[in-house]
Amino acid sequence: MNQRIERVRAAMQAQGLTQMIVSDPKSVWYLTGVEVEPYERLLALYLPVCGEPVLFLNRLFNVPNPPCKAVWHDDVQDPVAQIAGVVDAAATLGIDKEWPARFLIPLMQHCPGMRVVLASDCVDDCRACKDEAEQTLMREASRINDEVNAAVKQYVRVGMTEKQVARFVDEQYLAHGCEGNSFTTIVSFGANAADPHHEPDNTVLQPGQCVLVDMGCRKNRYCSDMTRTWFAGTPTEKQAAVHELVHRANLAAEALVKPGVRLCDVDAAARQVIAQAGYGAYFNHRLGHFIGQTDHEKGDVSSANTAVAKPGMIFSIEPGVYLPGEFGVRIEDLVLVTETGCEVLNREDKNWACVGE
């Protein structure tokens, strides 16, 4: 944890900051090991560049041995006044994007004239590059996702509803000891798969339809995410061709990932494959997103992101083609940027398969 705090402090110094309030519960855990869901109550870590960090905790939080100095409050005390007594009102204060206005505005009233700036990047950029312990947890979450995906492929049958299949996915995660899903499972049959974020409904799987399953679990606080697309029976020539196209786009992007490569160029590698086949207009989202303690963390793989890949980054590669009124295909893996290239965390087969027969 000390190494993580020092990395954040270095980022703060690079931005000219001497102090910061970290309030995102996942970032607080990342830096201190304290895991709390505060709900409407105040949870904050005061992090100075020099000096001991200070945790501000409600007495209802189950934190028996705080790893640093702790200032406690109950429900009738004013925790913002406690923070005001610790911060340097003459210096700029960085805050993260999760801190509610109901705490920030009173602090500014306690400390009139204090400059406040958004400093989420100081923590988020550190969280983007996973250390070895985090990489191990991400591999395990992806291994479970592969196993559950393989089970789903065997489970799906013509006549089932999208909700039935989604419920099976969720039950499998619990059976594998996961805390739950990293996001709401997406199951899309036929034309529903042309909506990238379709919510499972009572649509019944019919012969000849595509089956798109986008799924992820949360295990030991870390998330997985993958998508596979199959067909209920032998696909048509068009369905098979689109699936093969998306598969090639996925592989083209993954082959490019290594330290120093711009993330916009990774996006372009997949997009070019699809565009050259005449389907560019039907790939209507970015190629990928960063992932870790949450399914979508800061950072993406898109045409707008000129940042370069760095060792330890983990993000999705998920090209898709979505044909309104017909079907959709998406193939998604998570990749870990290594020192020399990338490691694809998902091993489950990406080729099209016949299911439900």
Describe every region a protein language model picked out.
Residues 1-357:
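Active-site neighborhoods and metal-handling regions in enzymes and metal-associated proteins
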